[in-house]
């Protein structure tokens, strides 16, 4: 079944709750969208959220790549060859992972809709659902505690807190957060490359009684080797984020002894589902746990990440909250959030429904 039409566009999506991380404040995000139609009318949609501060790709680059390559890549190609197209993109469009992700997700959506199955069933389901964390940006202690209580009251059971500005203040924050939310709420930390190895040891010792589940990307990604200066116990509970983009990165980080015990896969870093599954296979083979994370993204790509996560045996953690603070989106559905758990429906493809019809 051939792909007969392809369209792309971008839209600015404002956040209802701007937030800060270690190096900037985020108030709105511009996402790129790809819409494909097969000759029998079946459609598929994908989205991408370029993160220039992580991958070097901005929205202008995404648009340029799609303008120059989208139709050549997909028009008159058989949707059954979607994996070949994804593999080709990994070689030719390596510098634009969000643009690749938008195409990749649209292909996976169209293929699974064509087969009248949810994407996770096409990929091969390993899990039914997972708890997801919800993220609190860098804020004052009082603001953090207030937001944390709000999220707990909304049913979230895992809080991820951005840190990295001051290890002493971070320790105080985690202690007060634990006191505020009690022992039944899980706490994760994302240092966003803000620590040295000495800071990491100091933070781990200072929060040893607070039951921090793990810490994400504690050191700058050009200082990965410094992780060998900390104990194996700390490394096992550290997650590679900015240090892990491509399948090649996963292979390199899988070398013994492991620098990280957790891989944080984001479709906007990997370039979509196809390369993400390659990373996941490396993790599974190497005994490394998987976390699936995100940028600020449409429900489209969040749903894609969830379908992929539920298909991977090594998946252990979810941090797929990237669409929850969008003031608007282009679709509904795709995932179900209940009592902090994320699951997918039995709808075909990604399970998303267009709010407005796309004209091509």
Across the structure, where does each feature detected by a protein language model lie?
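N-terminal capping/lid subdomain adjacent to the active-site entrance of alpha/beta enzymes
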Residues: 1-187, 192-194, 201, 205-208, ...
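Shared catalytic-loop signature of beta/alpha-barrel
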Residues: 211, 222-239, 244-341, 345
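Extended hydrophobic secondary-structure segments
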Residues: 186-196, 237-246
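Active-site-adjacent beta->alpha loops and helix N-cap segments on the catalytic face
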Residues: 141-143, 165-181, 196-199, 219-231, ...
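A broad, low-amplitude sensor of folded, mature protein cores
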Residues: 35, 110-111, 136, 212, ...
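Structural preference for beta-strand elements that scaffold enzyme active sites
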Residues: 33, 129-133, 157-160, 184-188, ...
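Conserved N-terminal glycine/acidic-rich loop preference
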Residues: 196, 211-212
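Glycine- and other small-residue-rich loops at beta-strand/loop junctions that grip anionic moieties
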Residues: 100, 136, 162-166, 192-193, ...
């Amino acid at each position: 079944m051939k792909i007969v039409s392809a369209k792309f566009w971008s839209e600015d999506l404002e956040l209802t709750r701007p937030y800060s991380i270690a190096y900037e404040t985020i108030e709105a995000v511009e996402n790129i969208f790809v819409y494909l139609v097969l000759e029998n009318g079946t459609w598929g949609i994908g989205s991408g959220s370029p993160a220039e501060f992580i991958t070097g790709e901005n929205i202008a680059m995404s648009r340029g790549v799609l303008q120059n390559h989208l139709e050549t890549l997909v028009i008159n190609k058989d949707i059954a060859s979607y994996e070949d197209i994804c593999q080709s993109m990994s070689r030719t469009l390596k510098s634009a992972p969000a643009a690749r992700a938008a195409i990749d997700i649209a292909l996976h959506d169209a293929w699974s809709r064509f087969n009248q199955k949810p994407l996770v069933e096409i990929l091969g389901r390993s899990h039914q659902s997972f708890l997801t964390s919800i993220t609190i940006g860098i804020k004052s202690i009082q603001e953090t505690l207030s937001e944390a209580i709000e999220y707990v009251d909304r049913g979230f059971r895992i809080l991820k807190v951005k840190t990295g500005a001051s290890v002493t203040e971070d320790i105080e924050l985690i202690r007060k957060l634990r006191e505020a939310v009690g022992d039944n709420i899980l706490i994760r930390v994302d240092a966003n490359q803000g620590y040295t190895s000495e800071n990491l040891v100091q933070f781990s010792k200072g929060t040893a009684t607070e039951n921090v589940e793990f810490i994400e990307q504690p050191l700058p990604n050009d200082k990965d080797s410094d992780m060998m200066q900390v104990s194996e116990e700390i490394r096992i509970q550290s997650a590679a984020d900015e240090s892990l983009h491509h399948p090649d990165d996963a292979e390199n980080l899988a070398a013994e002894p492991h620098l990280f015990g957790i891989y944080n896969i984001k479709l906007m870093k990997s370039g979509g589902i196809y390369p993400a599954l390659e990373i996941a296979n490396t993790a599974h083979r190497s005994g490394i746990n998987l976390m699936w994370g995100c940028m600020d993204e449409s429900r489209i790509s969040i749903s894609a990440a969830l379908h992929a996560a539920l298909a991977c045996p090594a998946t252990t953690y979810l941090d797929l909250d990237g669409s929850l603070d969008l003031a608007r989106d282009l679709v509904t559905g795709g995932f179900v959030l209940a009592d902090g758990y994320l699951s997918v429906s039995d709808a075909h493809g990604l399970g998303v429904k267009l709010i407005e019809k796309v004209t091509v």
